[in-house]
């Protein structure tokens, strides 16, 4: 699924982060390396950004534009659960940029359940090992659909129990 985009643009990496300034600044080297490796520009959606020369800083991005930017990205780089989940649901190649000691259980859980833990980049050196950023979403979508069915069943049971009391 690709959402319509009213902007004609060259392929890009979308970097979406709500982390603090220091963490985003550390991620800049990873983003530069990915951009150089795959010949892509970077579009940034962050609260604020240190000076950079590798892309475009986007401001005032509303919900429609946000979804369109993710859907039309060549690669999404994020540290956000929602950025990760949307990339998976929309079938967009992605990387989670975070340090090894970060324990965001929502992100880690979904990545583990879908066998996508290799999509975590913790250092600039790890970019060297990336040969192809594409993801085969066929098997992932099967697993994702099973997880969604299980969640739906759980919610239906929970709501029925609550309605009887």
Language-model region placement:
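Active-site anion-handling motifs in enzyme catalytic cores
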Residues: 1-165
